[in-house]
Structures are given as C-alpha cells and as structure tokens.
C-alpha cells in the first residue's frame, strides 16, 4: 500500500531521559551530579592512590570541596526517585548537616596536613595535624552511623560510601605518617586495626544494602525492570565501584600504588520508545523476561570487536528497523567468540557489519514508536524499533542507518569533563542483547547495550612500578569444575568458583620489563576448605602445561554454606620470587589438596584476583623483613616476649627461625640480629615447657630408664629441607609380632592433677604409623601422611649450600604454619596433616603408683614407614566442667578394674606357681620331677600366661603391672624347658623344625595342625623315619610317644641296638583289647588310664585338655585396665607371644595317645624307627628320657 501521511512518529521521550521529574508534587531538577562525582572519584582512585597531600587535595577537588548542601541533597534524590521513597525530614536534615560539617572539617584537616608536609619537624605543625586528624576521625566515627539509619539505608547509601571512603583515607594517613606526627606505635597499630575493621564493615554494608534495595523493588512489569536496572546501575556507579577500592587503603598490604580494575557490567536503558504515563506495558516484555534473557550470565571478561546488524521492515509504510544482530568479541589472550543471533537474521537490507578498531564509548540512538494506520476497520499498528545508531570510538564513528538523539553519555557520563568525551569517557561498549514482543496490534523491538568500566584494561600488562591487580575473570579459559559467578558486590566484578580440586583458569599477561626480571604474586580469595594453589608459567597458548613457579597454601576462611562477605576474603602472602618464561606469557592456575589431604574436596574456593609485583631487591628485603617480624611477634603471648602462645609448635619456631636466617645481611643486619635473639628465646621457652626427654633425638636406648627407647632399625638423621633439627625414620617390618617402635614414659612427677596434656609434632610422611598415649586407657591414632619428597618445586632439585647443607633460603613450596589437623576426643580428622596432635587427660596423680603417660610410635606393616620430628608433650589446660567429670569417671573405672585385676591375679598366680613348682623336685628349681613331660611344661606355661597385664598389649616390650611375677614364673618355665631338653636325647622330637635330624625313607610329611602344632604324618606303609641316638650304656631310659592312628593297621615306634635288644610301642585305632609288650596300656582301658593319670598328678599338671581349657575363676567380662573401649573380649591379649610360650601349643585333639616304655641300652648307640603297617600314622612327639640315678 502507499505510504499514509497520517502515520505518526512519536519521538523518544519522558522518563527514559528526563529533564525533570515529579516527586510528591514537587519538581526537582536532576543532572546525574552524584554519578558525575562518583565516576570522577573512581577515576582518581584508579590512577592516584598514593597517600599524601596530593591525594587529599584530590578528594577535595572531586568531592568534598565542590559538594555543598544542594549537591548532597541531589545525592539523596537520585535514589529517592528510583525507589519512590523519601527520607524522613529529620534524617535528611541530619545527614546533610553532618556531611557539610565533615566537609568543613576535612578542609581544615587538609590545610593542617599540607602545613606539616611543608615543615614536618615543627612541633606546632605536628601537633595541629594530630589534633585535626583526631577531631575529624571522631566526627566520622560519630556521624557515619547517621548515614545508615534504619529504614533509610538505601537512599542514604551513596553518601555513606563517600563518608566511608573519606574515613578510610584519613585512617591510612595516620598509619603511614602517624609516628612522624608524634603518635606512639601503639596508637598507630590501633588505628591500623580500626582501618582493617572498617574496610570490611563499610564494604559489607554497601553490598548488603545494595542487595536489599534491589530486593525490595517490585518485579512484575517492564517498567518495574526499568526502575530495577536504573537503581542497579546508579548504585553500582555511586557505591559499589567505590567500595571495590576500599581494600587498597590497607597501606601495609599496598605500600606502593595498586592498579585496580572494575570488570563489572552495567546496562543502559533499553532502546525502546515507551511512555508509561500514556501507553500500556502489555506491549512490552515482563520483568522476568527482561532479567533472564536480556542480562548476560556471569562470564569471562570480553572485548567487543564486531557487531553485525540485520535490518527488518514492516510492510505497512515500509518502515525499516534493527531486526537482529550478532556480536563477535574476544577474550584477553584467547580467540574470537561469536554470539548466537539476537532477534531475527532479517535480509530486507544487506547486513551491516561494523569492526571497531577501538573502544565504543558512546552511542547516539534513534528508538521510535510509529503508529501505522491500517485499512479500516483495523486499529492503528504500534511499531517500536531502533531506526538508527551511531557508534563512536576515539578515532572514528560508525553509523547504522542514521544518528539519533538518545545519548548513552547521559546515563554513563565521562569520568573527566575537562577533556572531550573521546578522551574522558568512563565506559566502553562490550555487548548488546535484543528485546522483542509481538501481538495484536503491535510489534516491539529494541536493543539493550552493556558496558564495562574503562579501568578494565584490554591487556593484562604488568607495570613494574605498581602492584598489578588482575581479576581472574580476565582469563581466557576456565576448566571443567570452574565457574564464573556473580560477585558479592564489593569485588568490582564477577569472580571464579571451583567445587573440586583441579585446573582453575588460564590467563595471558604482558611483561613491561626484561624477561629475566623476577616477580611475586598473591591471591585475594575466600575458601571453605584448606588447599594449595599452583601457578604455572610458560604454558602453551591453550593454557595447557607449563612449569611450576608458585605453590602456596590457601587457608580456609569460611564454613561451607556461609555467605561471601568482605571478612571471608583474605590475601595470601606474596609468593617467593619467580620469573616468566616468555612475553606475553600464559599463567595456569590450579587448586590442589594440601599435602596429605588425599582427594578430599568438600567445600568451595572463590578467587577474586591475582596481584603481581616486581620483586626488586629492596622490596624483596623489606617484604621478607616484614614477614619475619610478623612471624616472630606472633610466637609470643605479648609484646614483652614473656610466654609462648599455646598453639605455637616447635616446628613452627624452627620455620620462623629459617625466615630470620634468610633475611638479607646487606639490607637489615641489625633487625636480623634482633629477631634471631627473639627466636632463640622462643626456642628455649619451647624446650622448657616440653615434658619429653631428649626431644631433639640425640640418641635412642642411651639410658635404660630414661629418654627414648626403640627398635634397632630406627635411624636418627640430621636436619634437611623439612626439619631444621634431628628427626627419626621408622621403617616397616616383615612381621607384625616384631614391630618397629619408639617409646618414652612421661614420669608421674612431671604431671599435674586434673590437667589435659597434648602430644604434637611434625610428620614429613608416614604410612600405617600408629601413635598411642596411654594412661587410664589408650588414645590411638593411625596416621597416613603422603610425603612430597621435598619442599622444593617439582622442576628443581633441592638446593644445597656450599658445605652440602640444605639451602633453606632457596625458593621452595610455601610453608603455612597454621595448617593443622588435631585429633581429639569425639572428633575425626578430615585428613591427616603433616602437623599432628593427640591429647590425653590426667586425673589424680600418685608418685607411688607412678602411672605416668606412655608415648608410643609403632609400625607393624611391611609397607609402613614414617619420618617425624619436633615432638612435644606439653600441658594444654586444666580440666573443668564436663571434661573434669569425664576424667574422674574414667579414673574410677580404671581403679575398679585395677582392683578386680589384683584379685584375679592373686588366684591365677597361685595356680600358676603351683603348676610350675610341681615340675621340679625342689625349691632350687634345678631338677625336674622324673615323670615331668613336655605336656606338663606346656600346661604350666599356659597357666603362667593367664597372668594378664604382664606387658602392654600395644607394645609387648613395655612392662605392665604384673611384669615382675610373670617374669619370675616365666623364667622357671624356661628353666624347665632347658632341663627337659638336656634330659631328652632325641633331637627335634616335637618336629617343630620339620624333619631336621631325622632320616627318611619313602614319602612322609610334617604338617602344622591346630594353631601351628607340628606333627609327623606317615601316610604309606613303606615309609619310615629314623634317628640314631647316642646313649649311656647301662643307664635306664624312658621312651615316651604321643601319637594318633587313622584307619586300619598299626603304627609302631621301635627302639633297638645293632644286633638285638629291641622294644616298641604300638598304636592302633582298635576296638578290641590288645596287649602290648612291655606296656600295660590298651586301647579299651586308655580312658581309664588317663583318668588314673590325672588323679595321680592332681597337684601338678593335669594334661593337655584340661591345661589348655578356660579357667572359670577368670571373669569373662574383664576389660583392659588401659584401654576401656578397644578391647571387649575379656582379655587384652597380644597375639605375638613368645615362640616357646603357650601361643604355639594348643590342646591335643581327641584320639591322641601317650605311651611309654623303659629301655636299658647295652651299647652307646640306639636307633629310633617310626613306621606303620596300614593307614596313616600321626606322631606328635617322641621323647627318650634319661632316668634319674
């Protein structure tokens, strides 16, 4: 159809770019003055953060010298009109009056400061500047709370940020110049502590109030979104951008100029011609649509390179408009990123592609609303679209269809109005999204531009004269498991988060100095887990690979699930110096578990930025000195160094000593000597409170009753790159019955009643290391600490000094003395740290009992090992409340069990002693009874071993409460064995050594049965076992055999000489009575004979079965006197008993028979032969005993 001259074009108008607005019936002129002032202040903070008169004058020039009551009122109105809420008159008047008073006093303070700068040694100028500082400081402490009056925090927030910034500035002055003014060191430190506290307080208030203000707005319609976005943009510019620079006021962290960057994005109003007073929001998207699809998700910082615009048209009237577009951007150091098509890829005109060779700092747009008349009776069609935009760069302009009147500079004005906008602009265009909604009868399209602050540079260039702050969102690649999340409000942009250990991000840096120069870096981060951050340099362009340059710990700063606040963010110390590999270079950052933490990764790590500084010699020496001073002072409970802090470990002191030793003699020799004396004093205090003897491992087993005792395979080694002093190495063992061990007893005389004590130390690495503390019960921990092999970087060998000693001053992996893993009652470690602690409670002390505390380290596995040192046993704290009641209860239970044990021991000892005495003919224990056999000795030994607590079950070399009586009886048992061996002329008659000393014909076996009992098995009738034995002719002998016959036939044990004089014992599995030559024992009457045998020796040993059975006099529920919980079987047994003890002998199974005969040899040699006629013959033992004369 033909163009209708009645079609109307309504110009962009009203609230999108107001000249004036109506609030509560009162007309108020606005001009974004608060935004102008804030942008100028941010530009000043970015480029001129050096303290002194120049900085103060800048604050006057940009804020406090030009803003009067009307301007402060405009600050308030700026927010009031957005949230449609007026501050109460009393609060408004008080705030403006206080701001005016602060401005006046600040001007007086600046005058006094400048006078002092010109004449710093004049007492009058020093006194005046101190007075003016204290007055202004007091006013700020008083008045700042008036800018956060409950109910009006949001409209007051922009003036709160200005006052907070002023307060931090003058506090920094007092910390830097205070001592030169005449303030004491204590005053200066108190001001510094207030400065740090207020940095967090002010930043958190700004972020929290910003979020609360946005959350309180309605969120339904398009117009709601317009208000929401304007408030978000204005509070970002006037509050959050300023708060992002608050941490830079920490002059001890930033002794030189930091270079800050703001990477956040702000959005100008959508280019849609809409008048909410005249038109319906039904033709526009809802709040949720605008927020979810027109606002970008958190992402890496990108740079706009190209914008391709597709033109669409509406057939009625042939109206052309911006129908869709595509954005091509790039990451710093990365390739191009092409966005999806926004809107529609229309082709009513050829696409217009704009490649910008510089930042777009301004747009002049033409959003229109055309009321198109359609054929009757159709209503007019509302067509909203963008019919033209001009994009301006500092050197050129790019126009799409035509230039408009909607100027982006009205919403984002320049930061410097003294120069043309192409030089003084504040923001650059970074992206564009698209709005579209259609219906009857309307079509609404529009564009939303997003902008980044000019301070975010287009390269990550390292300025050697400044501390370079690089937000990690300026990387070019995030790895799986890493995500970009919305920043908490005070970081100046988005941040990175990682939930699991692994690669974090890769970024490219440009070096503005020789490639050989060395640098240091640190991180600003928050974390709900302890971890390590690895920095690799020289990675490939893909971010893969590289060489480890920095490896430093990140200490946990928050709990899992805790909200991010300024207080949860911390800084690492500057790393050791490193060098870049190329220019530009690729930095790879990854998060790894702490040494010994395994794969545990619960929690999250958030990183805001990395900070890089040139490591010149002076700065390096000053930084090292500051770090050493901080570490030394942190050792003591007070500035007079009277006492050590309880949590300062001996290992910690050694590492602080290394820091001091590595200080430069050239730059700080006097300070180094002073700090060295303090560290030596700390070491002496550590030695004094340590109750262990010989904690430095001068020797093991040097003295029988004191110091360390240990197995012979333990080695003592001198200091290395991990330990400064001696440490011990415990190897593994092939037999758990013979563990590697190290122990020491803490004497009762050193202990205080009702006190908790702590064992702690440092483990370089360990596997299956068992640690015990024993008093009333056993505190036990198995510690596995994977070692690093060295503290030096993976790319370098451990440096050594000129004499072969470890060079502890060479660059190495960062040491964090705060990392610890304490294993206490009711707690379990998430992982095993190199630092270990184990505590034990002491109740009443008794020097007569001398219970003391046993400290034991043990390894009982073949793969086990440990390297440990800096061991301490020290008083932790007195027991109170529940802990006191618990130890009293444990002590009572221990004493009750001790009494039960004593009663039991009296009974068991009496029975065991009677059994042992019955083996001998007299009390001199030098002759055995004639009829004493091996079973009787075993049975007596079994009864002796019923005496409990002879040795500690945790380590059987340590004597227990019944050690004396046990060793008394056990010594007599060994005497019995020796006398018995001397009397028995047959060698290896119990087959414990296999077939040693026996001659074998045919196939025979020695088998272990019933818990290591060795028996001879003759399975074939043609097999024979024999032994030649020397005897005394004319003397009498007893041949005694214990054996068992399976199946038919007979088993025979024969004794004979060369020609004659033969006798034998026969064994069969028979039913009928058989008579054996020279032996009256038969199969049918064997049981009766055994009963007679038992009756004969009632007062002595009662045979295998009875002797190895349970003793009903022993309480079945008796628990260990040492470890109440770990042992519940009624016995605290150690499975590793003596090889000659009862542990290797168990009761004979039913069916075994013991037979004997008397034999009188006529020559000096006899032969013992064992065989059978059929079936299987099993022999337990063969004895040939010399009769007593």
Curated annotation (Swiss-Prot):
<dbReference type="InterPro" id="IPR038979">
    <property type="entry name" value="Pest_crys"/>
</dbReference>
<dbReference type="GO" id="GO:0030435">
    <property type="term" value="P:sporulation resulting in formation of a cellular spore"/>
</dbReference>
<keyword id="KW-0749">Sporulation</keyword>
<dbReference type="Pfam" id="PF18449">
    <property type="entry name" value="Endotoxin_C2"/>
</dbReference>
<dbReference type="InterPro" id="IPR005639">
    <property type="entry name" value="Pest_crys_dom_I"/>
</dbReference>
<keyword id="KW-0843">Virulence</keyword>
<dbReference type="Pfam" id="PF21463">
    <property type="entry name" value="Cry1Ac_dom-VII"/>
</dbReference>
<dbReference type="InterPro" id="IPR054544">
    <property type="entry name" value="Pest_crys_Cry1Aa_dom-IV"/>
</dbReference>
<comment type="similarity">
    <text>Belongs to the delta endotoxin family.</text>
</comment>
<dbReference type="InterPro" id="IPR048645">
    <property type="entry name" value="Cry1Ac-like_dom-VII"/>
</dbReference>
<dbReference type="InterPro" id="IPR008979">
    <property type="entry name" value="Galactose-bd-like_sf"/>
</dbReference>
<dbReference type="InterPro" id="IPR036399">
    <property type="entry name" value="Pest_cryst_cen_dom_sf"/>
</dbReference>
<keyword id="KW-0800">Toxin</keyword>
<dbReference type="InterPro" id="IPR005638">
    <property type="entry name" value="Pest_crys_dom-III"/>
</dbReference>
<dbReference type="Pfam" id="PF03944">
    <property type="entry name" value="Endotoxin_C"/>
</dbReference>
<dbReference type="InterPro" id="IPR001178">
    <property type="entry name" value="Pest_cryst_dom_II"/>
</dbReference>
<protein>
    <recommendedName>
        <fullName>Pesticidal crystal protein Cry1Ca</fullName>
    </recommendedName>
</protein>
<dbReference type="Pfam" id="PF03945">
    <property type="entry name" value="Endotoxin_N"/>
</dbReference>
<dbReference type="Pfam" id="PF17997">
    <property type="entry name" value="Cry1Ac_D5"/>
</dbReference>
<dbReference type="GO" id="GO:0005102">
    <property type="term" value="F:signaling receptor binding"/>
</dbReference>
<dbReference type="InterPro" id="IPR041587">
    <property type="entry name" value="Cry_V"/>
</dbReference>
<dbReference type="InterPro" id="IPR036716">
    <property type="entry name" value="Pest_crys_N_sf"/>
</dbReference>
<dbReference type="GO" id="GO:0090729">
    <property type="term" value="F:toxin activity"/>
</dbReference>
<dbReference type="Pfam" id="PF00555">
    <property type="entry name" value="Endotoxin_M"/>
</dbReference>
<dbReference type="GO" id="GO:0001907">
    <property type="term" value="P:symbiont-mediated killing of host cell"/>
</dbReference>
<comment type="function">
    <text>Promotes colloidosmotic lysis by binding to the midgut epithelial cells of many lepidopteran larvae including Spodoptera species.</text>
</comment>
């Amino acid at each position: 159809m033909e163009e209708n001259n009645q079609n109307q074009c309504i110009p962009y108008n009203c609230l999108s770019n107001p000249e004036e607005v109506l609030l509560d019936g009162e007309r108020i002129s606005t001009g974004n003055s608060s935004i102008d002032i804030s942008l100028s202040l941010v530009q000043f903070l970015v480029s001129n953060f050096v303290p002194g008169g120049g900085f103060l004058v800048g604050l006057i020039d940009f804020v406090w010298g030009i803003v009067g009551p009307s301007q402060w009122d405009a600050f308030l109105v700026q927010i009031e009109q957005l949230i449609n809420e007026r501050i109460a008159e009393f609060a408004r008047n008080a705030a403006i009056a206080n701001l005016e008073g602060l401005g006046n006093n600040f001007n007086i303070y600046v005058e006094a400061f400048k006078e002092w700068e010109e004449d710093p040694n004049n007492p009058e100028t020093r006194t005046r500047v101190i007075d003016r500082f204290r007055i202004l400081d007091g006013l700020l402490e008083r008045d700042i709370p008036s800018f956060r009056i409950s109910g009006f925090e949001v409209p007051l927030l922009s003036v709160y940020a200005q006052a907070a910034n002023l307060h931090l500035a003058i506090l920094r002055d007092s910390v830097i110049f205070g001592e030169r003014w005449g303030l004491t060191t204590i005053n200066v430190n108190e001001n510094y502590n207030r400065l740090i506290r207020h940095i967090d307080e002010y930043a958190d208030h700004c972020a929290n109030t910003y979020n609360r203000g946005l959350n309180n707005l309605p969120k339904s319609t398009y117009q709601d979104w317009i208000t929401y976005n304007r408030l978000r943009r204005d509070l970002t510019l006037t509050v959050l951008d300023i708060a992002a620079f608050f941490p830079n006021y920490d002059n001890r962290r930033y002794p030189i100029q930091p270079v800050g960057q703001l990477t956040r994005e702000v959005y100008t109003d959508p280019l849609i011609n809409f008048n909410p007073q005249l038109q319906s929001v039904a033709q526009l998207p809802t709040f949720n649509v605008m927020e979810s699809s027109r606002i970008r998700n958190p992402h890496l910082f990108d740079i706009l390179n190209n914008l391709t615009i597709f033109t669409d048209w509406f057939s009625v009237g042939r109206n052309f408009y911006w129908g869709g577009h595509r954005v091509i951007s790039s990451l710093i150091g990365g390739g191009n990123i092409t966005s999806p098509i926004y809107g529609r890829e229309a082709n009513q005109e050829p696409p217009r592609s704009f490649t910008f060779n510089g930042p777009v700092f301004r747009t002049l747009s033409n959003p229109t609303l055309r009321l198109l008349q359609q054929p009757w009776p159709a209503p007019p069609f509302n067509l909203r679209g963008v019919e033209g935009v001009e994009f301006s760069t500092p050197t050129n302009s790019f126009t799409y269809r035509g230039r408009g009147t909607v100027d982006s500079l009205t919403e984002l004005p320049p930061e410097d109005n003294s120069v043309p906008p192409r030089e003084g602009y504040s923001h650059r265009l970074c992206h564009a999204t698209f709005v579209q909604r259609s219906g009857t009868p309307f079509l609404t399209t529009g564009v939303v531009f997003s902008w980044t602050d000019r301070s975010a540079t287009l390269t990550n260039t390292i300025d050697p004269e400044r501390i370079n702050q690089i937000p990690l969102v300026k990387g070019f690649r995030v790895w799986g498991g890493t995500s970009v999340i919305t920043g908490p409000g005070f970081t100046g942009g988005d941040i990175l988060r990682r939930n699991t250990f692994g690669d974090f991000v890769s970024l490219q840096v440009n070096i503005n100095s020789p490639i050989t120069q060395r640098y240091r870096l640190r991180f600003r981060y928050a974390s709900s887990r302890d971890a390590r951050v690895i920095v690799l340099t020289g990675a490939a362009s893909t971010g893969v690979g590289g060489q480890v340059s920095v490896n430093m710990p990140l200490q946990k700063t928050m709990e899992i699930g805790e909200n991010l606040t300024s207080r949860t963010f911390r800084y690492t110390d500057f790393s050791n110096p490193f060098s870049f590999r190329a220019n530009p270079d690729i930095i790879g950052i990854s998060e790894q578990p702490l040494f010994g933490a395994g794969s545990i990764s619960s929690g999250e790590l958030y990183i805001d930025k990395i900070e890089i500084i040139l490591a010149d010699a002076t700065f390096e020496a000053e930084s090292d000195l500051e770090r050493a001073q901080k570490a030394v002072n942190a050792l003591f409970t007070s500035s007079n160094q009277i006492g050590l802090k309880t949590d300062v470990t001996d290992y910690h002191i050694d590492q602080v000593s290394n820091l001091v030793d590595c200080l430069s003699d050239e730059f700080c020799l006097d300070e180094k000597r002073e700090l060295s004396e303090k560290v030596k004093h700390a070491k002496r205090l550590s030695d004094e409170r340590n109750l262990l003897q010989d904690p430095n491992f001068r020797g093991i087993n040097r003295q029988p009753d004191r110091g360390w005792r240990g197995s012979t395979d333990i080695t003592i080694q001198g200091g290395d790159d991990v330990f400064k002093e001696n440490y011990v190495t415990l190897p593994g063992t092939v037999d758990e019955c013979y563990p590697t061990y190290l122990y020491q007893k803490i004497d009762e005389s050193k202990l205080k009643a009702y006190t908790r004590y702590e064992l702690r130390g440092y483990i370089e690495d360990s596997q299956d290391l068992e640690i015990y503390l024993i008093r009333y019960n056993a505190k036990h921990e198995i510690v596995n600490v994977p070692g690093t092999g060295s503290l030096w970087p993976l790319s370098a060998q451990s440096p050594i000094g000129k004499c072969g000693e470890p060079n502890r001053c060479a660059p190495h992996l960062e040491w964090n003395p705060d990392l610890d893993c304490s294993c206490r009652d009711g707690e379990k470690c998430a992982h095993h740290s190199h630092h270990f602690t184990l505590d034990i409670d002491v109740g009443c002390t008794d020097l007569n009992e001398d219970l003391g505390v046993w400290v034991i380290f043990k390894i009982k596995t073949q793969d086990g090992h440990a390297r440990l040192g800096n061991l301490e046993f020290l008083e932790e704290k007195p027991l109170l409340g529940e802990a006191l009641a618990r130890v009293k209860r444990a002590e009572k239970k221990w004493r009750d069990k001790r009494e039960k044990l004593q009663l039991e021991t009296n009974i068991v000892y009496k029975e065991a002693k009677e059994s042992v005495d019955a083996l001998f003919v007299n009390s001199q224990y030098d002759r055995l009874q004639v009829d004493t056999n091996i079973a009787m000795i075993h049975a007596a030994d079994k009864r002796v071993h019923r005496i409990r607590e002879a040795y500690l079950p945790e380590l059987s070399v340590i004597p227990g409460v019944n050690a004396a009586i046990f060793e008394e009886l056990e010594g007599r048992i060994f005497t019995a064995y020796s006398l018995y061996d001397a009397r028995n002329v047959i060698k290896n008659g119990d087959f414990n050594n296999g077939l040693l000393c026996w001659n074998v014909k045919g196939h025979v076996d020695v088998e272990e049965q019933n818990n290591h009992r060795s028996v001879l098995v003759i399975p074939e009738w043609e097999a024979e076992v024999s032994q030649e034995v020397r005897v005394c002719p004319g003397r009498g002998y007893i041949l005694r055999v214990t054996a068992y016959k399976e199946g038919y036939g007979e088993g025979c044990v024969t004794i004979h000489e060369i020609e004659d004089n033969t006798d034998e014992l026969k064994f069969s599995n028979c039913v009928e009575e058989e008579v054996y030559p020279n032996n009256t024992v038969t199969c049918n009457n064997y049981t009766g004979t055994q009963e007679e045998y038992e009756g004969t020796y009632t007062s002595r040993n009662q045979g295998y079965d009875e002797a190895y059975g349970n003793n009903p006099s022993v309480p079945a529920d008796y628990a260990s006197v040492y470890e109440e919980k770990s042992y519940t079987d009624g016995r605290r047994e150690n499975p590793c008993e003596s090889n000659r003890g009862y542990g290797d002998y168990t009761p004979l199974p039913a069916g075994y028979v013991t037979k004997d005969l008397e034999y009188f040899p006529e020559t000096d040699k006899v032969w013992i032969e064992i065989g059978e006629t059929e079936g299987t013959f099993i022999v337990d033992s063969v004895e040939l005993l010399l009769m007593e004369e």
